[in-house]
Every structure is written in structure tokens, then in C-alpha cells.
Amino acid sequence: MKSSFNILLHLALLALPAVGQAQLTCTTNNGALTITGYDGPGGAVSIPAAINGLPVTRIGDKAFGSCTNLTDVTIPNSITSIGQRAFYFCTSLTNVSIGTSVASIGQGGFCYCWSLPRVTIPAGVISIGGAAFYDCTSLTNVTIPTSVTSIGDHAFSFCTHLTSVTIPNCVTNIVW
């Protein structure tokens, strides 16, 4: 049974500057939560690993899309997938920390994040969707871990400052 609800979070974490109150919209299915929306002030946001005792396991499609004031995001180890266009048009995003349990980055997951200079794709990611980092014009280098087997079309297209991409031999499918 799916249900939707809003959760008001106070994100005054020691490791990150206080960002005030951030509102996350979630859905629940089989005892796990998917983040489906964000309506907070931006700045630095640390996505919680659990809310009210339920694990947060997925960032849904367009959940943080067009959050132009978002500058830093920490994705916990509880997250297993990042949905399509989850962070698209987060034009002020300068840092993203992706948890080690993420297995897939959806199509357009971080496209148009013009201020993002670097991204560490953790070991465990199997699939990088098409246009995942499309037009991330500040991105300078990317190392693909050996766990990745598939890279979608245009995953790094129009990353105009990208000077180095390291792709391991285990990648069996690259769509151009």
C-alpha cells in the first residue's frame, strides 16, 4: 500500500551548516521511503537514511529538480537508486556525496548541474543512465568504478571542461 505524506525536517547538522527547515515529500511502499519532492531553502542538504523508523531507499524522479539554490547534497548509504532527472537543473550544486549503496543513477540524474566541478561515482554503481551528467559544464574529470557495466547515451555530453574520463574494461555497454 502506498501513501504520501509530508515530513518536516530540521537539518541543523554538525557537519553541515544549518539550513533551517526543509520539507521532503515521500511515498512509502513495502516499508521503505522514496523521496519524491523537496521544497526547502536550498543550501546544504543531507538526506536522512531513515524517517520515523522507515528506511529511505530511493530518490525519485525529479525529486530535487530545478532546486537552483541547492549547493551541497549528501546521499546516505541507505539509498539504492537515484531516479530520472532527480537533480536536474540544480544549477548551484557544487558538491554531491553519493552513498556506497547506490546501484543506479537514472537518466538525466544530474543533468544541467552547471556548477558541479567533480563527482565521485562510488563502487557499487552498476548503471549510469543516459544524459546522467549532460551539460555539467564545470565537470573536469570522472572516474568510473569497476562495478559499472552500462553507461547510457550522452551520459557526459556537453561537459565542456571535462578533460579526463577513466572507463574500466568491465563496462560492456556504452550507448553513443
Predicted feature descriptions by range:
Residues 1-23:
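Sec-dependent, cleavable N-terminal signal peptides
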Residues 21-37:
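Short beta-strand/loop segment at the start of cytosolic alpha/beta domains
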Residues 28-30, 41-58, 68-81, 91-104, ...:
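Structural signature of tandem-repeat unit edges
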Residues 37-38, 50, 63-64:
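Acidic, Ser/Thr
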Residues 61-63, 83-88, 106-112, 129-134, ...:
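Consensus positions within tandem repeat domains that build extended binding/scaffold surfaces
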